[in-house]
Swiss-Prot record:
Similarity remark: Belongs to the methyltransferase superfamily. RNA methyltransferase RsmG family.
Protein's organism: Campylobacter jejuni (strain RM1221)
UniProt KW keywords: Cytoplasm, Methyltransferase, rRNA processing, S-adenosyl-L-methionine, Transferase
Name of protein: Ribosomal RNA small subunit methyltransferase G
Catalysed transformations (reactions): guanosine(527) in 16S rRNA + S-adenosyl-L-methionine = N(7)-methylguanosine(527) in 16S rRNA + S-adenosyl-L-homocysteine
GO molecular function: rRNA (guanine-N7-)-methyltransferase activity
EC number: 2.1.1.170
Location(s), subcellular: Cytoplasm
Residue sites binding S-adenosyl-L-methionine per the record: G69, F74, V119, Q120, R134
Length: 188
């Protein structure tokens, strides 16, 4: 995938991003052979899906971004490749957390922090400016398990499918941006 062709990425260091993406793909391939981290067929498509939110939302003021259920790193790892904020990834699966820790070392990502625990068990030392999650669970339970990380200024950014409209019943302050079948939901 040629990232320089996308206008919303013009203000980022794409050479560094593409180098880190290459490391990511090599490491994922290596780990996937042993640990079966993901069944994704088109990694580039999922990387693009992870960073497309930058076309809709400005992360520049966010100091602490928490990602819930980080799995193989979508979307947080790719945002961390591009952005300066501190990314706190919560992934209780030991194999996936080990992959993320190895990736942090290999890509020299000092802004990436990996927590091998469920977010609801985390004794917080920070409040997140932004909380991200990609298709982990319905909105209301997600809001509940993140209560230790949020305050009145926290914004949730969720990567969802068409079911998002039913999940937002009785929730008032949100925006949805669409890219093909993906719905990017921003809850304020």
């Amino acid at each position: 995938m040629i990232f320089k062709d996308y206008d919303f990425l013009q203000n980022y260091d794409l050479k560094n991003f593409e180098e880190k993406v290459k490391i990511y793909k090599e490491l994922l391939s290596k780990f996937n052979r042993i640990h079966n981290l993901t069944h994704l067929k088109n990694i580039d498509e999922n990387i693009f899906d992870s960073i497309k939110i930058l076309d809709f939302y400005d992360f520049s003021k966010a100091k602490n971004i928490a990602d819930i259920g980080s799995g193989a790193g979508f979307p947080a790892v790719f945002l961390a490749f591009l952005l300066q904020g501190n990314f706190h990834l919560f992934e209780p699966n030991p194999k996936k957390a080990a992959f993320l820790r190895t990736l942090k070392i290999e890509c020299e990502l000092s802004n990436l922090h990996i927590y091998k625990e469920k977010v609801q068990e985390y004794q917080n030392i920070f409040k997140a400016d932004i909380i991200t999650s990609r298709a982990l669970m319905d909105v209301k339970p997600l809001l509940e398990i993140c209560k230790n990380l949020k305050d009145e200024n926290t914004v949730f950014i969720l990567w969802k499918g068409s079911e998002i409209y039913q999940e937002l019943e009785n929730i008032k302050d949100y925006e949805i941006f669409e890219n093909n079948l993906r719905k990017y939901c921003i809850l304020k």
